[in-house]
Each structure stands twice: as C-alpha cells, then as structure tokens.
Swiss-Prot record:
The modification Phosphoserine is found at residues 549, 660, 670, 700, 712, 737, 753, 768, 790, 795, 813, 1444, 1456. The keyword Glycoprotein applies. InterPro entries: AAA+_ATPase (IPR003593), ABC1_TM_dom (IPR011527), ABC1_TM_sf (IPR036640), ABC_transporter-like_ATP-bd (IPR003439), ABC_transporter-like_CS (IPR017871), ABC_transporter_C-like (IPR050173), CFTR/ABCC7 (IPR009147), CFTR1_ATP-bd_dom1 (IPR047082). A lipid is attached at residues 524, 1395 (S-palmitoyl cysteine). Epithelial ion channel that plays an important role in the regulation of epithelial ion and water transport and fluid homeostasis. Mediates the transport of chloride ions across the cell membrane. Possesses an intrinsic ATPase activity and utilizes ATP to gate its channel; the passive flow of anions through the channel is gated by cycles of ATP binding and hydrolysis by the ATP-binding domains. The ion channel is also permeable to HCO(3)(-); selectivity depends on the extracellular chloride concentration. It comes from Pongo abelii (Sumatran orangutan). The gene is CFTR. Residues 423-646, 1210-1443 form the ABC transporter domain. The lineage of its organism: Eukaryota, Metazoa, Chordata, Craniata, Vertebrata. This is Cystic fibrosis transmembrane conductance regulator. ATP 2 binds at residues 1219, 1244-1251.
Amino acid sequence: MQRSPLEKASVVSKLFFSWTRPILKKGYRQRLELSDIYQIPSADSADNLSEKLEREWDRELASKKNPKLINALRRCFFWRFMFYGIFLYLGEVTKAVQPLLLGRIIASYDPDNKEERSIAIYLGIGLCLLFIVRTLLLHPAIFGLHHIGMQMRIAMFSLIYKKTLKLSSRVLDKISIGQLVSLLSNNLNKFDEGLALAHFVWIAPLQVALLMGLIWELLQASAFCGLGFLIVLALFQAGLGRMMMKYRDQRAGKINERLVITSEMIENIQSVKAYCWEEAMEKMIENLRQTELKLTRKAAYVRYFNSSAFFFSGFFVVFLSVLPYALIKGIVLRKIFTTISFCIVLRMAVTRQFPWAVQTWYDSLGAINKIQDFLQKQEYKTLEYNLTTTEVVMENVTAFWEEGFGELFEKAKQNNNNRETSNGDDSLFFSNFSLLGTPVLKDINFKIERGQLLAVAGSTGAGKTSLLMMIMGELEPSEGKIKHSGRISFCSQFSWIMPGTIKENIIFGVSYDEYRYRSVIKACQLEEDISKFAEKDNIVLGEGGITLSGGQRARISLARAVYKDADLYLLDSPFGYLDVLTEKEIFESCVCKLMANKTRILVTSKMEHLKKADKILILHEGSSYFYGTFSELQNLRPDFSSKLMGCDSFDQFSAERRNSILTETLRRFSLEGDAPVSWTETKKQPFKQTGEFGEKRKNSILNPINSIRKFSIVQKTPLQMNGIEEDSDEPFERRVSLVPDSEQGEAILPRISVISTGPMLQARRRQSVLNLMTQSVNQGQNIHRKTTASTRKVSLAPQANLTELDIYSRRLSQETGLEISEEINEEDLKECFFDDMESIPAVTTWNTYLRYITVHKSLIFVLIWCLVIFLAEVAASLVVLWLLGNTPLQDKGNSTHSRNNSYAVIITSTSSYYVFYIYVGVADTLLAMGFFRGLPLVHTLITVSKILHNKMLHSVLQAPMSTLNTLKAGGILNRFSKDIAILDDLLPLTIFDFIQLLLIVIGAIAVVAVLQPYIFVATVPVIVAFIMLRAYFLQTSQQLKQLESEGRSPIFTHLVTSLKGLWTLRAFGRQPYFETLFHKALNLHTANWFLYLSTLRWFQMRIEMIFVIFFIAVTFISILTTGEGEGRVGIILTLAMNIMSTLQWAVNSSIDVDSLMRSVSRVFKFIDMPTEGKPTKSTKPYKNGQLSKLMIIENSHVKKDDIWPSGGQMTVKDLTAKYTEGGNAILENISFSISPGQRVGLLGRTGSGKSTLLSAFLRLLNTEGEIQIDGVSWDSITLQQWRKAFGVIPQKVFIFSGTFRKNLDPYEQWSDQEIWKVADEVGLRSVIEQFPGKLDFVLVDGGCVLSHGHKQLMCLARSVLSKAKILLLDEPSAHLDPVTYQIIRRTLKQAFADCTVILCEHRIEAMLECQQFLVIEENKVRQYDSIQKLLNERSLFQQAISPSDRVKLFPHRNSSKCKSKPQIAALKEETEEEVQDTRL
C-alpha cells in the first residue's frame, strides 16, 4: 500500500478533498489493485482505536456495578461528535435563510417598491454566498461524522473479537455463529453512515421552529395548515413503515427457508447431481420463491406509496399553506414563491430527517445494549498452574457442560452429606443427581509422571474430549483438583487449518528453528506431500485448508502440536483420517520416539496404541471404567472391548434389542427437547442469558430425557462461513438468514446480514459456536479439491532410520522456552483473504441495461406509460403557470389601470376563485397520475427478478462440476441471497426514484426554457458537466466499493476461523497473534472504506460547486434581464433551486442504480454458465443387435428384466479424470472390468484418488475414455439416465431441510408402505418413529437431530429405494458409531446381494468382504486382483492386513489340504485383539 497524500495535504486540500485526485485519476484510466490503495492514518488503525475504547470500558467495569458501554463511547468520541454537529446545524440554518433573500429579491420587482430595486444585485450576491457557505459547512461535517462512525465501528469490532477469544466454552455453547456475525454486521453497520443522521434529532425541531417563525411572518395562522398536513403525512408514513415491517418480518421466514435449501443445495451440489435431484431441488426452491414473492410485492407496494407520498406532498403543502391566506387577503406571488422554498426545507425536516434520526438513535442504542450484554458474558478462566510441576494429576474430578449444574451439584452433594448415610456409598447420590443433569465426567482420578504416555479410550460420548478440555481449562471442574505445569500443546480431533502457508500453520507464531521444523516435518510424514507443491511449504492454504486431503490436514495439525515446546501434549484422536501404514509410522516415529521424553495424553481406540502406553484410562459414560497398565487391563477387565467400542456384536441382538439400542443412540446424539416448532418460526435470539433458550435450559433440569445429554463430540454436518465469499465445506448461511435487517439492505447485505438462525426443531437446536468448533472440515472435500492437492504414493521401501529424530527428541525434552514471534507477512494475508476481482466491468455496460429491460416484454410498455403520464404532468404545470402569469391584476380600490401581457404580482380573492378550482383539479389529476404511474413499473421489475432467479437456479443446477469447482460456495450463495435481495427490494424503487427525479428535472427545464431561454442555454453545459463528472467518478468509486466489499470477507472469515480453532488458540496462547491478524484484516478494510468515503465526498462537493456556479449565473441573468414590475424572476429562481437540488439527487440516484445493476451483471454471468454435456455419439447396436436407444429408457426405479441396467457389469477403458478443463490429470489411463454382482474394494493411501474415481464414474469430472454398463457406453445416453444406474453413499452426507419423506423420496414416487419397508430394512424405522409426525417430521439444519450414523442410514435407504444395480460407497463408516456400522454391513449383504458394489473404505473388516481389489498409486492402477493374489504378493493390502484377519478369511487354510475359494462372510464375535478400528 502507498502512503496517503492526506498526511501532507494542506488545509484547503483537506477541505475540498483534493488529495483524492491521484486515486480518482488512476481509477479512471486503469483497474485499481489493492496495492494502489492508500495506507490508513495512524489514528484510524484498529490497534489504537481498540486500545482507547478498551481502556475506557475497563474503567467503566471497574468503577460501576452497572457499567454502560455508551459512557465509554461518550468519553472517546463525544466532543468531536458535537463539534461536527454544530457545523451541520449551521449548514442547515443557511437553508432556512435562503428563502428570505429570495423573497426580498422578488419583492424588489414590485412596482410599488422601487427603492429596493437597487439592492437586488446585493441580495443576489448574498444568496450566492449562502450557498457557498452551506457547501463549505455541510460536506466536512458529514464526512467527519462518517469518519467518527467508522472509528466507533472499528473499536467495537475489535472489542467484540477480543471478547470472543475470552468467552467460556459454556457461553459459546449458547451463542450461535449467526448471532455473532449479526452482532458484527447488522448492528455495527448502523454507526458507519447513520451517525450523520443522529444530530437531526435536535437539529430538525430547531429547524422547524425557525421555519415556522419565518412562514408565520409571511402567512400568519395559515402557515400551520401546511405544518399540520406534514405531521399527518409523517404519521401516515410511520403507519406505512409499520405495515412494511410486518410484511418484511413475514417474508423473512420465507426467504430464510429458501436460502437454507439453496445453501444446502450448493454445498452438496455433487450429491444432488449424483442422486439426479436437480429437477426436484429446482421445483422445491421455486415453490418457496413463489410464496416469498407474494409478500415481496406487498412490501414493495407499501414502500412505493411511502416514496410517492414524499414526492407529491410538496404540491399540497404549499397549496394548504397559501389557500386560507389567499382566500382572506388575496394571492401575493412573492409570498407564494417564498413559501414554496420554505416548504421544501420544512418537508425534508419533518418527513425525512427527524424520523430517520429517531430511527437511527433507536437502532444505535439497541445495538450498543446488545454489545454491552455480550461484553459482560462469562469469560474463560485459566487454571492456576505451577510451572515447576512435572507430573499431571487429577483427583476426584467431576464436571458438567451445562452452566448451573455445578452449583446444583454442590448443593445436592451437601444435602447428601447432611443425611449421614451409613453405607457412605456415592452411587445413591449420583443416581439421584441424574434427575438434575448427568455430569460429563464423574469422579476421575489418575496420575502420570513426566515422559509417560497415557492412552484414553472409550466409546462415543464417554467424555474423552471433555477430559482434555478440562486439562486445558475449557471445562471447569465442579469438584476435585487438577495439577500440571500449564505448558500445554494440543492437537484437535478435527484438524484445524488457518488461512496461511503450511509453514505458518506449523510454526503458528512461534519463533522459527530450522532443525526443529525439519525434524517435525519428517516425523509427521509431511516431506513427500510438501515436495509435491511447486511452492513447497510456502504454498498458501485457503480457509479450512480446502486444497488438502483430510490426512494431510490431520498431519499438519499434529506437526503444529509437536513443534511447540511444551510439558504436556494432548492428542485428541489425531490419526482418524490416516491410512494404516502412515498411522503406524507416525505413531512410532513421532509419538513414541520424537516425544519420548515428554508427557503425552493420547485419545485412541487402537489396541496397538494401548499396548505401547505407560498408562491406560478407559472411560464409560463419563466414569473411569479402568485405570492402569495394559497387562492389568487384560487381567482385571476382560470385557473392556465392548466398553472401548461402545457395544457388542450388533447382529446377535434381537429386533427389539436393536430398536432399543437405536433409540438410545438417537437420544444420545440428539440435542435436548422434543417439541416441534413450526417451519416458519424465526425468532431473533437475544444475547441475554434470560432469553428463550435460557428458560428452556432451566426447564430441562426437570426433564430426565433431556438431562442425560452428555457433551459428545459427534460428527455433524460441517459448518463454515461462506457468504463471505470464502470457501470451505459448508456456508454458515444455512443457519443464518441473509434477509436485510433494515431498509438500507444494500449496505447491510454485503456484510452478511442475519435476521435469525433459521427454522429449528427447538430454540436450543441450532449450531452453537461450540458445535462449530467440534465439527470436521474434512468431509466431502473431493468436490473442492484442486489440482494442486497432493497425492501420497504408497512406498514399499523400508523407512529411513530415525537417528535425527532421536537427537531432536532429546532437544525437545530440554526445558528451553521459545520466543513468540508476532510478525505477520501482510502479502500472505492478502493472498489468503482476497479473491481475484470479479470479471465484470467496473461500470455497468449498456448491454446489461438492454438485456435487463428485455427480460420481460411488458417492461418496455411500462416505461412508455411512465413517459406519457410525465408529459401530461408537464402540460398541467404549464397550465398553472399560464394561469398565474395571465390573470389580470385587479385592485379593490382602483381598477383604472391594468397591465396586459405581464406577470401580475397580486391577485385579489374576489375575482379569481376560478384559479383555485382549476389548481385543485390539476392537483388532483397530478396526485392520481403520480401515485399510480409507478405501480406497474415496480410490479414488472419484481417479475423480472423472479425470472432471473429461476434462470440462475436452473443454470447452477445444470452447470458442470468443472465450472462449479472454480467457484466458491459463498460466492454462489451470495448471488441467491445478496444479489436477489437487491433485485427484489432495492432495484425497483431505486429505478423508480431515478426515473421520477429525471422527469422532474426535465419538466422543470422545459418550463424554464419557455419562460427564459437564456437560462436554458446556461442549463445545457451544466448537465454536460454533471454527466462527465459522474462518468469520471463512477469508474473509481465502483472499484473502491468492490475492493471494500471484498475487504469485508477476511474480517468474518477470520472470526469463524478463530472460533473453529479456539481451543487450539488458547492451548498455544496465540490470542495476541490472532488479534494482530484481525487488526490487519480490519485495517485493510478500513483503507478501502475510508478512501471510498473521501472520494464520495469529493464528488458530492464538486456537484455542489457546479450547482453554485450555475445558480450565480441564473441569479444575475434573472436580475439583469427582468423588466420592471414582472414576477417572472420568482418563478425562475424557485425553479432553478428546484432543478439543481433535484438534479444532484438524480445524479446520486443514477450512481445507486449503476451500483445495484452490478448485481444484475453478476446474475447474468451465472445464467450464462455452460451446461453439462449432452450425448456426443450416435446410438450403437447393442449386443443382441437391438439399438441401444431402445434399451436405454428413463430409469423409473422399477425392476424389470428388460430395463437397463439389468446385471451391473462395468467396463472401464483408458479413463482419465481432471477437476477443471486444462488442469492436471488426477487419474490417468484407468482400465479394468467388474463382473455383475461383484464387490470391488479401492485401496490407496490418503489423497491417492479413490474418491475421485467414484466421482469420475458418475461423470462429475472432466473425463476422457469410456465406461460401459451392461454394454451401453456413457456417451450414448443422457447424464440423468447414466447416473440413475448408480446408487451412491457419499463421503459427505446430504440431508436437506424437509420432511423424512422428502429426504428419502424427493420426486414422491413411492408410497408410504414402500418407504416404511425400506426404513425397516436399513434400521431407520425406530429412529423415524421417535419423532412427532414420523415421516412428516421436518428435519432442519442438516438433520442436526440425527447422529452421523443415522444420516448414513438415510443415504443407504435412498440407494435401496433407487433399486440401482451398481452401488458406490465412499468411506461410509467414517465417524460411525459401532451400532450403525453393523447395520450398514448387514444391509449391504441383504439388500444389495445381487448388485455390483464398489467400496472405498478405511476399515479392514469392511474390505474383507470384497472379492477384488483395485490398488491406486500415483494416479494409476497399480494392481487389480483377488484377495488371494494380493496376500501372496508384496502389496499395500498385505502390509495392512493382520494375521487374525487372515485366519478369519481362510479358516481352513492350514487344516485342509485342498484350497477352496474363500467364503466372504460376516465377522463373527470379535476377540480382544480383533476389535481394533484399523484403517487403510
């Protein structure tokens, strides 16, 4: 960034904003880059502002019991705020004084007042000087107030972020990510531009008092008729506003429903295509859109009448003010024109400025109170540590996640002790206490010495992660003691990657040690992966590490934990995404050797890990089931395997027992409560703890079903922040509505507006921040994975010796603290955060306007209708002026002289009542035409919006994955949220306002041209100057606005990234580092926003200066050319003032239209996306001689012998796959064939391309080569027909918001009996029956009430219903509880017994049921053989399989002389050694 010219600018340059000229010139000539933007003044830096406000807030907290944030803000900003307010008031006063001088100028032309004629020229000079003074006062004042508003926003942004990093996990569990984003976006945006309006709460009443005094002097009591009308009008507008709010609140729920479904569709677009659900999703979203648009139209009509009322009120205010006076004393032209000028100012003060100011104060105080409540929430308490401690001790520790349960626990325990029970057994106490709430950890004891490895095991929900959280201080123990040194390193269960390079992710702000870094890289098996990237470890990873495989992310997270020098290393299931060989190598080299002298706590379920551990702790339902060594475990707890894995062999249970297990599993994985809430219920969640969900928590204590909920790290659908134009797995907008929260939707929507957290099962059932932190980012990454993704190759060579690691291990054990580095590479920050600028022009092209107008045929006729009405209005205005100009002057006392062909100054009441009749008739006509001329326009523009939305939706659903892979999910969602909201709400009325203002200006110019041709000559160059200035400014302003919009993304991205990794941040003590990063992101945004505000003020000031020059010319031309006794000067000066103020408004409105039309350009860009390919080859003869097109009919999911596919035979020839056109090949020359009904397992290391191959089968990638199913080539049929041949269980489970029935059968092809039959078959019946409404129960939020296992069963049921002959399974057992895993295995054997199954899996047990194995290595097929051959050869499979698995496969190999074919059967009862959760 460049140094700002503002620093060296002179006072004059600052006053006229001339220092912005270089950036305006550059923006006009070329495209602006981030490097062209000026640095912010030091006074605006986030560091300075946040420190200033934080100091005052701390002072407020320390000095008062009831601290007020507004007091802290007042001490920081009040005096500057009032200073600019006084300037603003003085500028407004000049508006009130101008009509006085105008009246004196008109009066000087009264034939009876000749002595004033000589001072007319001086009055003209005075009038012009007032305009100059107003310009010099108003613009610096408005800019100064905007500047203060910006500083307040920055300071509060920073304060909220710092507080977020300090919040306790219990508080985070109650706050949704939507609420946090809402706090930052909706509430704080009110300060940016609203602060300039705040002063009108006192300026407007003073202005009205001054104006009424001046009008009283002119018209006496009749002045109050006009004021009365304005007050009635303001009340009418307030009523319309309330009505509009009612419609908008109703519509918010509908918009939310549509956006929830749309975001689910976008993030799961690969699954939608795989299931062939494009038409179903399109129809579903269009139906929701239809109901939404009905309310949109109602709200638009109300807003239209509100806007029209303002435009046409001016006519009647003047009429009602002058009428009573004129009837009594006659018409005085001087007074009419002066009154018109006064009423223009009065109308603005009463109907616009004051109501807006009141609304601004109401919104701002509400926002400040919300932030104040947030800033007083409970903070995370760091435990008291003793740095000299070498051991880790936990004594009698009990803990609850639910806030308040700890206090209840203490009271209950105290009561229990008071009873003095004779047996002294605590079991009675705990069983009674379960009614209040089950502790997540109960009476835990262990002690480990320095350098020991403690393995923690247990089934899902046993409390393993909670134990680590308690050691880190995230979970506060209700009783008991924890003792350790406090120097902790942590590796999360779900890998967390921050935006930045691989190196920055591993070093994580700690000072760099080359030897240490290289040793860690080697131990974590990252050397080979890093070598694949051109930039090596300096490659920039996007948010969530989207370009990496799950295994690569897991190893980077582990490397980060190991790189930090700590006394205690907490490793929470770090090997979940690794193949068995990599896991084994890392466990040996890293955990056992590299960290040999460090204390380690490893959460695991692997038998080999337990054997190597010094101590083992097995948790069961929060209690310590066993603590000791492995040999003690085998002797004392022979049943430990079932506790370790969660259940016994599922197949051995009766149907009733299975159902009870499923029911219990459902309860454990659900969140509390069972009362359904209507789909449209969308309530704003308050931040106060006494809110709705707070009450439900209190009630839940008495509900035994709710109280058994434990804190369990359950894999739910991943969540992320995408409306922020950043990509990851899942945009957070699914939980968050993007409905505008105020009329200024254009300002709010780009900042990710939030109105509610979406429809939910219950208030508690939403995605809290805590859920966000405990969710995996690893699911379904193949849809996004770029060609740069590393592909690890399977190395069969022995590993190098680890002597270097031995050396480093000793270095790591030394008590040397490393320095913390806070340096941040700003270039990397920009690269991480800023997208490439959109490929649409800086200024909207004429082609876009033309295309927009022609979307709907009737729009052209509506525009012609508006023009006809306008011509009628101009004609009516000329009639009124003709009446005023040609009514003869009659004096009551003397009628001997009259002046023909002249403009009379006085008209008596007795002779000219007919003037008023005509005037009233014309006024009524204007009102009727004015009110209703815009309605057809608004109606038609909303219809255009509907058409564009439907076209865009169709284009996205039909676009190829190669195109969608290049787009970010947040970017797509923004088109459907922000841009469609602009097309619905802002664009129709902005276009109406612009057309209205333009026609008013043209009409006024036409009237002036008739009266005074000289003025018309002066008007032409002014209009040309306006157009040229607009074109010059627009080029730069639109680019700056775009840069500012893009600069907003990193702020919210960084917030969500920080929340996802909050436990890691705290464990590493990196809060200051991330605060610095956040301030950098804020400063980047501030630089763009400040420059935009400055250039906007430059433009507004130049427009004002042109107007002043024009008015000076008009004033002197009028004064010097008007003859004696003529009142024409009044009409000319009044119209000139009206022309220029309206023209300024029109120019600004045209800029708004151009800015909003960029949304239309973006929508058109999406509409023009390519569609998925159609068949390219002609139909080929089938094997039996018939034409393939006769065999290939639309698969109606009915099994008949003559319908393709019948057998499921599959032949693959020379298959090559790429993610994007022209990209690197992910798979090359893959060839193999599968017999009907055969089961094939895909083998390969993490990132080798197994999931990619499954995507290629479905034609979701750019592919070359050929695949045939039962002899039919994929080139000879449609994509829909081809994909319907497959049943799919994807890695990323897709549950959209809708009923169970809709989720299983979106096309509504099957009866309830058939759906229930399939549900029973896959074990879903008992799950569905638990919910009210059963099949009609509405699932929301990605099916958050279901466990990951139940979601997998839903996918399985879909595949059974599809009756497909080929089944593709992509790691179906990932994150499954053992119960669901057993169900899936059983269903595959029963329901798909005669189907071809292609399985990509990490569990060996599942792979053993495959007859053939396809080994993928270095993008190619390395082996394709049966189990027997792979076991005999040196292969990946041979290395992964254990001796016990071989015995299971070939039980008779040693006893039988004759080798028979192996029988693939279900696993029998598992022994202790076989229960391991081994992964390939």
